[in-house]
Amino acid sequence: MKIWITRHGQTALNKQKLMQGLTDEPLNETGIKQAKEARKKIGDIHFDAVYASPLQRAIQTAAIIGNVDKKDVKIDSRIIEVDFGDYELRNYFKLGLKMTTYWALPELLPNPKSVESVESMIKRSQSFLKELEKKNYENVLIVCHGGIIRSLCGYLEDRKNGIK
């Protein structure tokens, strides 16, 4: 099985450099263009399954890159973005030392209060991939988020700490 993992395209909140965890925001024009470019680069690959987190930005990106209707995208909440709690919608550059260092080294530092732990993120992403491994797919597309991609790659690369 070949697994294709990508992050969703740009949203207005991404453009404003705001932490966007569980806030449900659609793609902006740039994000739509990014997804179309990715589809072009992939070429004529057919995906046996197209998965996305339940957030609009991931579903839209998955439908475009996967070349399927939105209704055909398999939604799975285990690949939703990290819950940033009180840091949601804060500027990337104004997070403060605790969140900045945690996000740089989440496997070494405790999560700030209200922020989802790395253990939780790893547990749900590994559950998703272990279930996926049982499927008989040739090509699978997974469209999710920057945070969860770290734990998906950690599992696929067999990292001891479970995160990349």
Language-model regions, residue ranges each:
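Short, active-site-adjacent cap segments at secondary-structure transitions
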Residues: 12, 57-59, 81-82, 148-150
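Acidic, low-complexity terminal tails and accessory targeting/binding regions
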Residues: 41, 75, 81-94, 138, ...
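Short beta-strand scaffold positions
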Residues: 52-53, 123, 143-144
